Regions:
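Conserved N-terminal phosphate-binding loop of PLP-dependent enzymes in the Aspartate aminotransferase
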Residues: 1-140
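A short, hydrophobic C-terminal helix/tail in secreted or cell-surface proteins
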Residues: 141-146
Length: 146
């Protein structure tokens, strides 16, 4: 729909990327979408300032108009080495698989708590990307006014 209107599909993988959703390496894969642009960062450098933008050659060439851009996340050999090391650890330590296993366990246990705690609403998520809806006001005991 967005492409039919001349727009681009942009996936922000800053929080959902690098295996956090468990079943897939990228969050957009859960929606069966191939975005035109993907942004990523944070977990990419495991605390080291590193980010990236991935797109097609055609889209990238439209930005090749002489304007330069600089930021603190700009590429350098140290950051690139750290990013590669992070990818190696994700692979070697099977962190994507772990995100799925631990996430499935957490979601199951959190859903089990719903019957004991009325303030817990929906529990949803994939892998270690989990959301818990809470209704803290309905069952909250407020202090008595003086």
């Amino acid at each position: 729909m967005v492409r039919e209107s001349g727009g681009l599909c942009i996936a922000d993988e800053v929080q959902t990327g690098f295996g956090r959703v468990g079943a897939h390496y990228w969050g957009f894969e859960t929606c069966d979408v191939i975005p035109d642009i993907v942004t990523m960062g944070k977990s990419m450098g495991n605390g080291h300032p590193l980010s990236a933008l991935v797109t097609t050659k055609e889209i990238a060439e439209k930005f090749n108009n002489g304007m330069e851009y600089f930021n603190s996340f700009g590429g350098n050999p140290v950051s690139c080495a750290i990013g590669k090391a992070v990818l190696d650890v994700i692979d070697k330590e099977e962190l994507q698989k772990n995100a799925k296993l631990v996430g499935d366990y957490l979601i199951k246990k959190l859903k089990g708590l719903q019957s004991n705690y009325e303030f817990i609403g929906q529990v949803r998520g994939q892998g270690l990307f989990i959301g818990i809806e809470t209704d803290s006001y309905t069952h909250l005991t407020l202090p008595t006014k003086a």
